[in-house]
């Protein structure tokens, strides 16, 4: 499921929290490219890595849930006549990702890859509110994550 030709990607990686072990800019870019596949010839997006307080505040403001969450996606919606390659923003909570990886028995790298792919699919319009859409999204996520050599992210370890 790798793109035939690499997309022109501008990724603004913002690290707004302290962490001992984060993926590299190159890893984030490779996971974004994988998720975008051949959908867009070029894309601009931001990935912001945050602490629990910022995640909780954003989750409360935009989703009405007063707790931190692993990944929030904010798609960029431009008027139809404006052709910009702006995909949107992902906000990923570092402590939540680290805790989930440990609890679920996954490697931290595999879980980071999953969160980036999951968030990018949301930016592309995929959702998991309706069961049929959730199945389609999870199937695509699983294919992409397994193509990296990681196990199915939804399978119990």
Swiss-Prot record:
Free-text function comment from the UniProt entry: Single strand-specific metallo-endoribonuclease involved in late-stage 70S ribosome quality control and in maturation of the 3' terminus of the 16S rRNA.
Matches recorded under PROSITE patterns: UPF0054
Record EC number: 3.1.-.-
Lineage: Bacteria, Pseudomonadati, Pseudomonadota, Gammaproteobacteria, Alteromonadales
Name listed for the protein in its UniProt record: Endoribonuclease YbeY
A GO BP annotation: rRNA processing
NCBIfam families linked: rRNA maturation RNase YbeY
Locations listed in the record: Cytoplasm
Native source species: Shewanella loihica (strain ATCC BAA-1088 / PV-4)
Principal localisation: cytoplasm
Name of the gene encoding the protein in the UniProt record: ybeY
Family from the record: Belongs to the endoribonuclease YbeY family.
A GO term from the CC aspect: cytoplasm
